[in-house]
């Protein structure tokens, strides 16, 4: 009976597969949105102000950061929780694949969230004259919360690794 339970629990990891497939669809949609923004600004690029162009570029950077986060979560999550990817050509295998444990994934996700939040905050500051001070303050507080959380998670990870080495 115990063997059946253990095999069932182990096999249940495949229930995460549709989640990673769904994330890949999200990545496709994000890529479409990226190119939609590029096509959308092309007719106005000559007349666009420098700050307007910077805002558009910040939006593109934001999409790229979220896309990178999605790829990292999909690949490392699949390899950590479902199965190792069997890529035949070792030259095409990404260098970080198979090397990230759950804690390093959490730290990468946290630092990506801080980077994404930074881009949003920069975009907000560039349009500060149109935005209420309360909203700007709230966004700064949220960003600082992300930063402190990322530092806290990295510190905890460092301490747990140090404790693991000592034992």
Curated annotation (Swiss-Prot):
**Keywords, A to Z?**
Cell membrane, Membrane, Plasmid, Transmembrane, Transmembrane helix
User: What parts of the sequence cross the membrane?
Assistant: 15-35, 53-73, 136-156
> This protein's superkingdom?
Bacteria
The name on file for this protein is UPF0114 protein in repA1-repA2 intergenic region
- Give the record's membrane topology: Multi-pass membrane protein
Cellular compartments annotated: Cell membrane
Which organism encodes this protein? Buchnera aphidicola subsp. Acyrthosiphon pisum (strain APS) (Acyrthosiphon pisum symbiotic bacterium)
User: Does Plastid show up as a keyword for this record?
Assistant: no
Give the similarity note: Belongs to the UPF0114 family.
Q: Which GO terms describe its cellular component?
A: plasma membrane
Please give the Pfam families that the UniProt record associates with this protein: UPF0114
């Amino acid at each position: 009976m115990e063997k059946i339970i253990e095999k069932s629990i182990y096999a249940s990891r495949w229930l995460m597969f549709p989640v990673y497939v769904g994330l890949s669809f999200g990545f496709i949609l994000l890529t479409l949105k990226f190119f939609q923004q590029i096509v959308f600004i092309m007719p106005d690029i000559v007349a666009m102000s420098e700050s307007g162009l910077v805002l558009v570029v910040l939006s593109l950077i934001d999409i790229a950061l979220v896309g990178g986060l999605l790829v990292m979560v999909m690949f490392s999550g699949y390899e950590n929780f479902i199965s190792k990817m069997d890529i035949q050509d070792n030259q095409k295998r990404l260098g970080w694949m198979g090397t990230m444990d759950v804690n390093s994934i959490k730290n990468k996700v946290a630092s990506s969230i801080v980077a994404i939040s930074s881009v949003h905050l920069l975009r907000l500051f560039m349009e500060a004259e149109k935005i209420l001070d309360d909203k700007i303050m709230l966004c700064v507080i949220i960003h600082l919360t992300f930063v402190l959380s990322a530092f806290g998670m990295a510190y905890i990870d460092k301490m747990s690794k140090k404790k693991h080495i000592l034992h």
